[in-house]
Amino acid sequence: VFRLAAIIALSFALHPACAAEARIIVQQSPLAGFQYYDGKVLWDNMRVGDALTLVREPQNPHDSNAVRVEWKGQPLGYVPRRDNRDVARQMDRGVAAQARIVNLKDARNPWQRVEFEIFVELAVARP
């Protein structure tokens, strides 16, 4: 998916006068590690659609592909290890991956509380 996004972005970068914005969703995941951060304190202020910040942590001692997820500067957790490899590689290559909350569920299981999507903004041709 990231390769396709890069090809599309490059083709429109050559013709900026014909460009508009589009979003390609790269993946949708549950938030890992929510129970270890201040999510409980922030919960009442979080909303579906809120922007999240992705922070690459290549020196993380537990996972060299770690990507931390933050809400308004506050750490919430991580992209799950099983889903982070491609995102980490693309971030390391300079791809500006973005994220937002797509589901909030008041569940006992912390893996079910926050679901988010990672996307890339692209330029697309105008008709």
List the model feature ranges, each with a label.
Residues 2-11, 17-127:
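Conserved active-site motif detector
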